């Protein structure tokens, strides 16, 4: 059945409206991405300073043959904790699918029995996905802002660290998409606890020798190490949000480009149908005139 000219015109108008919406959403995502990238950059400055301070402290700590902090010491792994970061909604391309696919593969390979891991979810997509497959998150956070403050995520971070300290699990990982650029992200599963990426050998020897402490190193580490773990988890959340905004921008750009192609194809279809209708009318007029002669 041939499509009428009015139907094609309505489809063109509808697609143009959709294109305007996706284009506006793309611009909003681009603005969010710029702010997220700035927040991530500022966090890296802070994190590098905290890391340097800790490596310097740990260098002296090691030199004094003192016992390492529990947050630095591995223990037999009976249960593993995961913080899984997804978005609250769709319209972000393959952003969520990448993380959730990796989680299913990880569960199948390392936790086939299903009773030796716990999941904490940031983002409704991940939480709903887990529940649909019979995995109950021990904690979930929804409605996170595009540039989340630490106060927004403090509860879930503190919950994860508290569970580790109470030995409800023996290691903690964060699963998220790392932002590379506006077109690319990398799925990462990074160990947060016990802390394994602080190397005392990277310490500044001159700084360490001249370091004067009012409290003991143990007391300072008791304060700094949990804060460092908190900051690393928070950094992963900022990174994931940046990747989410980039994915949203790219998805809306793709949708806008696709809409333009659909409009172009429909316009060609409309012109052909209109030309056929005009040709048919001319043919009928000529035939009618011939019949009157």
Curated annotation (Swiss-Prot):
Q: Which family does it belong to?
A: Belongs to the ATPase gamma chain family.
Q: Would the keyword ATP-binding turn up in this protein's UniProt record?
A: no
- For the keyword Hydrolase, the answer is no
Q: What is this protein called?
A: ATP synthase gamma chain
What GO annotations for molecular function exist for this entry?
Answer: ATP binding; proton-transporting ATP synthase activity, rotational mechanism
Principal subcellular localisation of the protein: membrane
Explain the purpose of this protein.
Answer: Produces ATP from ADP in the presence of a proton gradient across the membrane. The gamma chain is believed to be important in regulating ATPase activity and the flow of protons through the CF(0) complex.
One GO biological-process annotation of the entry reads: proton motive force-driven plasma membrane ATP synthesis
Question: What residue ranges carry the coiled-coil annotation?
Answer: none
Q: Which organism is it from?
A: Streptococcus gordonii (strain Challis / ATCC 35105 / BCRC 15272 / CH1 / DL1 / V288)
Localisation = Cell membrane
Known partners and oligomeric status: F-type ATPases have 2 components, CF(1) - the catalytic core - and CF(0) - the membrane proton channel. CF(1) has five subunits: alpha(3), beta(3), gamma(1), delta(1), epsilon(1). CF(0) has three main subunits: a, b and c.
Topology with respect to the bilayer: Peripheral membrane protein
